[in-house]
């Protein structure tokens, strides 16, 4: 799409859909073109080439999130092969800075959207819960860059975190009771009181240089 400072109908529609300002959309369109090489779509390979992601231990999960149909609000599981600029904006909207005049209801919606995005990164098999094995894998990946932490230690950390999640969400469990995994409602409880609204950002796409939404 061609964007200009004369707010086109298409740009206004994107403003309404994503919550970004026209100025922010212009900035992100330049970044999209830089990533895609001025093509109309980007694929995983375009994001894999971002230097800031090369040392990120969960790079593959971050890249996959851009192509996850759940995050693209397509209402189904699986991944798309490529995304266009509007779909790119949809993903970037999860990282959109909060507006200073945003009311409590909109802040709550924004928070829930961000947490759903994170939940989807953990819930790799799309069964609506994060199992112990899924959580272990993420923890192992996060700690893989630390040579002083062995795999078994990472597994123990994941196991402990899952037990804590169970105590928060279920309470006192019976000795023979099995916690099958973290549901999205559980996930909301675990993150309660944590300021995800302002902490969740995306550094490798230069979001810091984008003005906050008005």
Swiss-Prot record:
Keyword Transmembrane helix: no
InterPro entries reported in the protein's UniProt record: CHP3, EF-hand-dom_pair, EF_hand_dom
Domain (EF-hand) ranges: 110-145
BP GO terms, sorted: cell differentiation; cellular response to retinoic acid; positive regulation of granulocyte differentiation; positive regulation of sodium:proton antiporter activity; protein localization to plasma membrane; protein maturation; protein stabilization
Topology with respect to the bilayer: Lipid-anchor
Family matches, as PANTHER family: CALCINEURIN B HOMOLOGOUS PROTEIN 3
Name this polypeptide is given: Calcineurin B homologous protein 3
Taxonomic placement: Eukaryota, Metazoa, Chordata, Craniata, Vertebrata
Gene it is expressed from: tesc
